[in-house]
Amino acid sequence: MGSPSWKPALTATRLLVLSRGAGGMTEEVEAKLRKAFADHLIVDFDPDQDLEALISPRGRIVVAGGDGTVEFIVRKFADTQHPIGVISLGTFNNLARALGLPTGIDQAMEIAKDGHQRAITLGRVNGRVFVEACAIGLFGETIALGESAKDMEFGKLAGKLKDVIAAKRFQFELSGDIQGSGAAMSLVFSNTASIGSQLPIGNATPMNPYLEFSVHAGRTRTDIVGRAVKSALLFQHSEDGAGQVFKFSKLEVKTRPRVRVYADNFLVGRTPATIAAEASALKMLLPK
């Protein structure tokens, strides 16, 4: 006989996930959220918690936090039928900006309660979901560098800087919706206009049914690293990062040599890579 699998006798139809680490989460804001969503099961964000065991299969999930928390929830529930409401409390709020969600808490709460449900576009690279972008090569290393700079994690910053310095130009070949080849320091496939510390990568939005391939979102190590660190430390979102872009639904990338692949700011392996735009099963709660 196998071991029994325990689940709560009842699951909630509404769940509020709070991130206490979000920059905009104050005691006053938390109290306002708890009052407004008193009819929800309220939990603190814990990436190791089995949230699926707490919520009914089509129950509404409202997440209040920064990009890391919000996008964790979106990736986790990408293939489910849950409606997801977002209350942005981070510094950059890349996904919320891309979806046209308000930054004001009162407006965001109204939409999270009674917004229009709509599927959005999510990216997948070798089966791994990404919300903002897939980056191959130096740009991916730089995203991680920018995150460490943003958080002032100087120990990690040194290690990430070493990865950036070690990055080299590679040969690439594209097939599928885009046919082409060449040499590059990095390739970027975006779903939002910015990533990480509001580092600009194009004009994409998850409201469109496609992703964008940036041909030269930073052509040299100095260009890419300079923009990443400047954006992270000064909280600036300049418009000089986007070069020529191509729209696509699916493509394959081969490189020589094999190069690291990042989904958002997470290392997910090395090339070759298959990258695709897919409509989410989950529905985001958006302005009507």
Enumerate the predicted regions with their spans.
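A short, compositionally biased
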Residues: 114-121, 163-171, 246-248, 253-257, ...
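ATP/nucleoside-binding phosphotransfer catalytic cores, i.e., glycine-rich phosphate-binding loops
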Residues: 2, 178-181, 215-288
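Hydrophobic alpha-helical segments that either span membranes
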Residues: 64, 69-79, 83-95, 102
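Short, glycine-/small-residue-rich phosphate/pyrophosphate-handling segment
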Residues: 91-132
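Short, well-ordered alpha-helical microsegments
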Residues: 51, 70-71, 196, 270
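ATP/pyrophosphate-binding catalytic subdomain of soluble kinases
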Residues: 126-215, 219
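Short glycine-/acidic-enriched loop or helix-start segments at secondary-structure transitions
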Residues: 26-27, 72-75, 95-97, 198-199, ...
